[in-house]
Amino acid sequence: MPTKIRISKDMILDAAFEIARQEGMEKLSNRELAKKLKCSIRPIYYQFENVEEMQKELYIKIEQYFYEFLLDNMVEGIPQYKQIGINYIRFAKREKQLFQTVQIKFS
């Protein structure tokens, strides 16, 4: 009978997202992830072939969060382009580390 997976891919990505959000992408490592998840680095390598694969999926998660943030809280009567601009500035203020990641990754 195969062993039960206790650390899922989603759990790893969520922990990586929180590290990137609080401390920045430069602090993200398998050791930091393992520490946050309270496990060894083995489950991380079990779910992802390498760090690049995990980072690729993390960038997708960050990008989705960024676009959802931009499109949230739309108010009727205000042009959409203005609201997106305001939300862009809000994102930069509230999510400093993720904003840097978005700017570096997509510039």
Feature roles, as predicted:
Residues 1-7:
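N-terminal intrinsically disordered/low-complexity leader segments
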Residues 3, 48-49, 85:
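Tryptophan-centric aromatic hotspots in well-structured domains and transmembrane helices
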Residues 6, 31, 60, 92-93:
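Alpha-helix N-cap/helix-start motif at coil-to-helix transitions, marked by capping-box chemistry
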Residues 11, 19-53, 57:
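Helix-turn-helix
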Residues 11-18, 53-79, 83-90, 105:
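Alpha-helical structural segments
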Residues 28-29, 80-83, 97:
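Alpha-helix N-cap and coil->helix boundary residues
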Residues 90, 94-107:
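Short secondary-structure transition hinges
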